[in-house]
Amino acid sequence: MKRILCWHFAADDLKLGYRDGRKIQAGRILSVEGTPELCLHGMHGSRTLLNALDYANGSQICRCEVWGQVDKGSAKLCGTHRKTLWIIDGTNLLHEFACRCAEDALALADNPDSRSVRAIEVKRLWVRGLATRTELAAAWDAARDAAWDAARAAARAAAWDAARAAAWDAAWNAARDAAWAAARDAARDAAWAVQSRRLAAMVSAEHKRAK
C-alpha cells in the first residue's frame, strides 16, 4: 500500500488532541477506525511544511507517512494510519524563520519603521535568553502600533504586520503569522515559494544537526 510522505506539527507535549491523548513517538504508527474525513476524523498531515504550519498547534515538527484510506484536500490530507519517522523540536527554528520572513517584508518597504526593526532584534535576543518576556511584549506592542500607523499604506502595513507577528512568544504562531503577512502584499506565489524553500532548508539542517 502506497505511503504518502507528509509533515505534521504536533503539540509540545507530543500528545494527540481532541481527547485522544496518545503519544506521538518516532517509529510509532497511530491509526484510527472508520473512514477518514478531513478536519473531522483521521491521521492528518500536509505535503509541504508551510501548509502543515498553517494547522500547527505546537512546535514539534514531525516527518510522517500516511496511508490506508486517504482523504485529500488542497493543503492537507488524512488517512487511516500515520507513522512518525522522526521528530525535531522546532521552537527556536520557527522563531528564526518568523524573523527572516519579517525581514523580507521590511526589505520591500521604504523607510522601515524603527519599532518594527526593533521587534525583530528583541525577538532574537529573547530566544537567546538575553531579553525578558516583558521586553518582548513591549516590542510587540510597539510593532503593533507601527502596523496601525501604517494601515493606510497597504505595502507598508504588510511589513509592519510581519514584524509584529515575528514578536509573538509562541514559535508556531509567530512563524505562521509572519509568513502570511510577509506574502500578503508581495508577489504572493513567489514569496510563498521562497518561504517554503527556506523553511524546508532550515528543518533539513536542524534534523541533520540533531542526528
Regions found by a protein language model. Give the residues of each.
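Short, glycine-biased loop/turn motifs at secondary-structure junctions and
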Residues: 1-211
